[in-house]
From Swiss-Prot:
Belongs to the poneritoxin-Ae1 family. Keywords: Amidation, Disulfide bond, Secreted, Toxin. The modification Cysteine amide is found at residue 19. Signal peptide: none annotated. Its main location: secreted. Expressed by the venom gland. It is found in: Secreted. Disulfide bonds join 5-17, 9-19. One of its GO terms (cellular component) is extracellular region. This is U1-poneritoxin-Ae1f. One of its GO terms (molecular function) is toxin activity.
Length: 19
């Protein structure tokens, strides 16, 4: 499933957000 990060961050391949 798709996970959207907030504040313009993007989802890292391993999970979590990169800002």
């Amino acid at each position: 499933s798709f996970y959207a990060c907030t504040n313009g961050c993007w989802v890292k391949p391993g999970g979590g957000c990169q800002c």
